[in-house]
Every structure is written in C-alpha cells, then in structure tokens.
A protein has these predicted regions:
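Core catalytic lobe of class I
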Residues: 1-270
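SAM-dependent methyltransferase catalytic region
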Residues: 2-3, 265-287
C-alpha cells in the first residue's frame, strides 16, 4: 500500500507515531542556488522534415510540459534539522535512515547527523557515481551524489546483503571465469546511470532518481511487509521501489506537481491520498 500525503512534511511527520518506520530514505533539495527544471518531450512521426531515425523514419520532438522547483535556502541546516529530528523519532529500533545529498551540503549535514544520532550510528557513505551531463574546464566535474546511512541502533540493523543485485568485476580476467559470471557484491561506490531523459522510467519530474539505486536500498535494508517513508517524495521513485518489492510506503511532498506526477505514476495501484493543512494556514484561518 502507498500512502501519499500532500502537505508540509514537518506537519505530516508530527502526526506519525513513534518508531513506526523500518526504513526512511530522503532526497531533500540540494541547495544548488537555482531552480531545478525538467522539460518533457514526445517523439512524433512525420512524413517530411524533422530528424531521421535509424530505420529511416522521420520524427519531430514535441514539448509536452515542464516542472520546476526553487532550490535556494538561506539557512539550509535550519530547514533540514527539525525534519531529521522527526526522522530519528520515527525509526524502529532496527531502522535505518538514508539521506541523499551532494557535495554542496553533505559534509554539513553529516556533522548535524552525527550530533543527532551519535557518530557510532553512522554506518556508511555510499557514493552514487554516474557519467552524464555537462562538464567544466575550471575544476574536476562533479559526477557523483552522496548517500549517508545512519542506523537507529548501530548494533542492530537490517542488512540483507544476499538480497542485493550483483555487479560486474572491473577486471573480470583477474577474478576468474566463475566469479566473473556470478558478479560481485557492490562496494560503497555504486556506478549507475541517471534516469534517461527519453527512457520509459522518466516521469518528467526534476531530480528524479533511478529505480536501480532505490531498489537496492529497499531490498537490502528492509524486509517484505516493512513500513517505509520518504518525506521528500518528488516523483515517488522510492515508493515505486518499495511497492515493487512488497513493502508499504508513506510518501510526503508539498508540491502539487509532485503529487500530480505520483498520481499518474501509481494509477491502477492501491493508493491512499491525504491532504494535510499546514500550521500557518490553520492559524490564519482560526484568527
């Protein structure tokens, strides 16, 4: 079951019970200092003009829409901190929190998480590496994201390593034929392409993360029937990964665009939709 909540995540989190989630993953805004925008395109066959495909057919691209959100914060940690406090409260004794960021804020967030959870509760930093997009000649081009893993209790947490997908050896000739055919358990560096702008997985939502990354987290760090949470849900990819693997998931986002994307994405699946009035709106109405 997927529960989708439309509202400020801090208001929604306050209504959820203590120790009620086995796994929490969040992909908050990265504080890039600019608007994040994704434009959707559809290829349409034409008789003349346009571009020529491999089979000789001609097509043109038609813009079908776009979505965007502001990614600018004057006090980023002041925004994120109260939500991380709530996340810790919501974790079960064997639960884990995954915080997906990039180079801009990850180091500051880690210091705050160390203070909140305790340094011993920091288990791993996972590097998601990809090779796509623009480059710069002014510095080394950043081509990775950082995912911080914290356990509610560093002595007891779910880690089903046997449930993970296996990846190819970088030097299969050195591993031997049998090992090369079987592949290896991933390390803390995960090479995975971004969501293709023209692939079936795309939703048109900015900053959408690939299912391959999220399904690995779901399978290894939770069990079938567990309850999961993503309170920066965006396009709903974490909920999709949870649902595909037999987990219940609560998804929260304040963006109408995100809610619309998730409603389209999960059409035909068992979904409950809730709207939570913000505290500021409620206080204005009650005056």
């Amino acid at each position: 079951m997927l529960d989708i909540h439309h509202g400020d995540n801090l208001d929604v989190l306050a209504r959820l019970g203590d120790a009620s989630f086995d796994l929490i993953y969040i992909d908050p805004p990265f504080n890039t200092g600019r608007a994040q925008t994704r434009t959707s395109w559809k290829a349409t066959r034409v008789a003349k003009g346009g571009r020529v495909a491999f089979n000789g057919a001609r097509y043109t691209q038609v813009r079908t829409g776009s979505s965007s959100f502001s990614d600018v914060f004057d006090d980023y940690l002041g925004f994120l901190g109260p939500r991380l406090v709530e996340a810790r409260r919501l974790l079960t004794p064997t639960g884990s929190l995954f915080v997906h960021l990039d180079f801009r804020e990850v180091h500051y967030a880690k210091v705050m998480l160390d203070q909140l959870f305790g340094r011993s509760s920091f288990i791993n930093e996972i590097i998601w590496a990809y090779d796509y997009g623009g480059r710069t000649n002014k510095r080394w081009s950043p081509k990775h994201d950082n995912i911080l893993w914290y356990a509610r209790d560093p002595r007891h947490f779910t880690f089903n390593v046997g449930a993970t997908d296996r990846v190819p050896y970088l030097a299969p000739g050195l591993a031997g034929a049998e090992k090369a055919a079987r592949g290896k358990v991933p390390t803390d560096t995960w090479w995975h392409t971004i969501v293709s702008p023209t692939g079936k997985e795309k939703t048109g939502y900015p900053t959408q993360k690939p299912l391959g990354i999220l399904e690995r987290i779901v399978r290894v760090h939770s069990n079938p029937g567990d309850r999961l949470l993503d309170f920066f849900a965006g396009s709903g990819s974490f909920g999709d990964a949870a649902d595909r693997n037999g987990r219940d998931c609560v998804l929260v986002d304040s963006s109408r665009t995100a809610i619309a994307v998730m409603k389209r994405r999960f059409k035909g699946r068992p979904v409950q939709l809730h709207t939570t009035e913000s505290r500021s709106t409620r206080s204005r109405r009650e005056k």
